[in-house]
Curated annotation (Swiss-Prot):
EIF4F is a multi-subunit complex, the composition of which varies with external and internal environmental conditions. It is composed of at least EIF4A, EIF4E and EIF4G. EIF4E is also known to interact with other partners. In higher plants two isoforms of EIF4F have been identified, named isoform EIF4F and isoform EIF(iso)4F. Isoform EIF4F has subunits p220 and p26, whereas isoform EIF(iso)4F has subunits p82 and p28. Residues 39-48 have a biased composition (Low complexity). Residues 23-38 have a biased composition (Acidic residues). It is found in: Nucleus; Cytoplasm. Expressed ubiquitously with highest levels in young leaves and roots, and lowest levels in flowers. According to the redox status, the Cys-129-Cys-167 disulfide bridge may have a role in regulating protein function by affecting its ability to bind capped mRNA. Residues 1-55 are annotated as: Disordered. Its main location: nucleus. Belongs to the eukaryotic initiation factor 4E family. GO terms for biological process: defense response to virus; regulation of translation. This is Eukaryotic translation initiation factor 4E-1. It comes from Arachis hypogaea (Peanut). Keywords: Cytoplasm, Disulfide bond, Host-virus interaction, Initiation factor, Nucleus, Plant defense, Protein biosynthesis, RNA-binding, Translation regulation. Residues 8-18 have a biased composition (Polar residues).
Length: 231
């Protein structure tokens, strides 16, 4: 499980994993939020009064980003359709947002949903990401919801020994599969990347082999880029 063993964060495991009642299960496919999400905001959907009065701060603030498949075809430059949705800084804000957004299985094919540390953009060109890379896991279509949640909890709960290396994560929804990628900032630090990859597999109880690709190689070779680390 994601947050059972490590005690790095000052927030307890129960506080991270305590999920208030899910408030919305009726979003239309392809939508992220149940109300108008046309503008980015740092204010999440309202938390319950009791939780809001006693917030549990996270070590880092995080921002959800969405790349709408319907907008991609209208954009000339790669990445220009990615937009921030919400920024959260407490456990309560995270659950308030998570319970009001679609999970990967309900997103339209072609959608990309990101969660990155605040002020880091989910792009190769971002200075923090430029020298990094990513681990990637693959799932059958509609089967990544739980692994996506556990990935988020592992990141925001600071459960990785090399958490400072982590930039964020993205889930890509495609016709036949879904992919979750964990982005890191210093690809050349093999020890840190291997540690992150191993812990991620443990958190998700993922048994297949995963590979790590440098962003620089991905930019040069696209899909022909080869894994530098494999576990």
């Amino acid at each position: 499980m994601v947050v059972e063993d490590t005690q790095k964060s000052s927030i307890t495991d129960d506080q991270i994993t305590a999920n208030p009642n899910n408030e919305n299960e009726d979003l239309e496919e392809g939508e992220i939020l149940d109300d108008d999400d046309s503008s980015a905001t740092s204010r999440p959907p309202s938390s319950s009064g009791a939780l809001a009065r006693n917030p549990h701060p996270l070590e880092n603030s995080w921002t959800f980003w969405f790349d709408n498949p319907s907008a991609k075809s209208k954009q000339a430059a790669w990445g220009s359709s990615i937009r921030p949705i919400y920024t959260f800084a407490t456990v309560e804000e995270f659950w308030s947002i998570y319970n009001n957004i679609h999970h990967p299985s309900k997103l339209a094919v072609g959608a990309d949903f990101h969660c990155f540390k605040h002020k880091i953009e989910p792009k190769w060109e971002d200075p923090i990401c430029a020298n990094g890379g990513k681990w990637t896991m693959t799932f059958p279509r509609g089967k990544s919801d739980t692994s996506w949640l556990y990935t988020l909890l592992g990141m925001i709960g600071e459960q990785f020994d090399h958490g400072d290396e982590i930039c964020g994560a993205v889930v890509n929804v495609r016709n036949r599969q879904e992919k979750i990628a964990l982005w890191t900032k210093n690809a050349a630090n093999e020890a840190a990347q291997v540690s992150i990859g191993k812990q991620w597999k443990e958190f998700l109880d993922y048994n297949d082999t995963i590979g790590f690709i440098f962003h620089e190689d991905a930019k040069k070779h696209d899909r022909a880029a080869k894994n530098k680390y494999v576990i």
